[in-house]
Amino acid sequence: MDGYDGKFMIIDLDFINILPQALLNRGIFLSDKIGVYEIGWKFDDVIKVLYIIKEKEMTVLGGDVYELNGDEIIITYDSWSFSGSNFIKSFEKASKYINNYYKNNGDNFIYTIIVSNATK
């Protein structure tokens, strides 16, 4: 969807264009589970996704955390956001949030990422 200030938001299937198929296959498509058009990843994979986004010089606008309980996905209402266009600072904020969340809460969570790519 075209957004604001010449930016493009990447959600759900748009990740196909920037992520390796193996990483996409490990993602959890939330539209199937809870009707949210995002892909969630466990900790190790979401860190890989962040590095790919950084390499593409895309800005992480924020993300959400969901708890995994067997096949059930539970909304935690935990999230982070970033305002600005510095892709390095956005990467650092997302990485710090996710790493801290993982250290404090364990491995039964997935993380979604909302990304904006300023047109060049």
Positions of the model-derived regions?
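Surface-exposed beta-strand edges and flanking loops
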Residues: L13, D32, G62-E67, Y77-S79, ...
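Amphipathic protein-protein interaction modules
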Residues: Y51-G106
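Conserved NAD+-utilizing ADP-ribose enzyme module
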Residues: N17-I18, G35, I39-K48, I52-G63, ...
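Alpha-helix boundary/N-cap detector
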Residues: I10, D14, Y37-D44, K48, ...
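Acidic, proline/glycine-rich low-complexity IDRs
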Residues: I98-K120
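Long, contiguous N-terminal structural blocks used for assembly/anchoring
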Residues: M1-G40
